[in-house]
């Protein structure tokens, strides 16, 4: 694929997305595209399916029907490939309370296949970016909810994803 065609393809494409939980319809026939390099927000009332849609794009739940492409990768058929380019931050910071902040970030950097030297460098860079460098040795359980959310953002950035999916990023 030439560079020009690559830059005009949408970074995220959801086509006729439907997600059901039993008889409950969480998402009904949602279609949209997100251009490369843009910021896109899902806005709606509680229960509208925003989090469910984000989780489907992040490969965490499987839609009942429809197609999702992330950087032209079909996430339903190649979730492991898609996960390498997606950074997902949920709405509530699930951190490992007994880990230090830098260990928490390092754990995810390791899971994404970064070697030891690259992990150390990326963890420091992400902690600096999220203003947590001075908390690097603090146990996650000692952090405020807002700081836990920043630690989660650092973890989300550590593998340099080309797509960020942030659920309620400004909640704290």
Tell me the role of every PLM-derived stretch:
Residues 158-162:
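A short, proline-enriched helix->beta-strand linker immediately N-terminal to the Walker B motif
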Residues 45-49:
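Walker A (P-loop) phosphate-binding loop of ABC-type ATPase nucleotide-binding domains
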Residues 153:
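Hydrophobic anchor residue at the start of the ABC signature
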Residues 66-77, 81-82:
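Conserved ABC transporter NBD signature motif
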Residues 106, 110, 117-135:
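Conserved ABC ATPase "signature" region
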Residues 164-167:
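Catalytic Walker B motif of ABC-type/P-loop ATPase nucleotide-binding domains
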């Amino acid at each position: 694929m030439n560079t020009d065609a690559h830059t005009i393809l949408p970074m995220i494409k959801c086509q006729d997305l439907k997600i059901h939980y039993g008889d409950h319809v969480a998402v009904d026939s949602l279609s949209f595209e997100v251009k490369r390099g843009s910021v896109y927000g899902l806005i709606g009332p509680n229960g509208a399916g925003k989090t469910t849609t984000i989780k489907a794009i992040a490969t965490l739940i499987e839609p009942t029907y429809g197609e999702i492409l992330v950087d032209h990768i079909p996430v339903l058929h190649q979730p492991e490939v898609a996960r390498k380019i997606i950074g997902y931050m949920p709405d509530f910071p699930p951190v490992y309370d007994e880990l230090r902040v830098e260990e928490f970030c390092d754990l995810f950097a390791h899971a994404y296949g970064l070697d030891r030297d690259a992990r150390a460098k990326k963890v420091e860079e992400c902690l600096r970016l999220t203003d947590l460098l001075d908390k690097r040795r603090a146990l996650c359980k000692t952090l405020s909810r807002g700081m836990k959310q920043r630690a989660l953002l650092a973890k989300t950035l550590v593998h340099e994803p080309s797509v960020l999916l942030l659920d309620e990023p400004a909640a704290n």
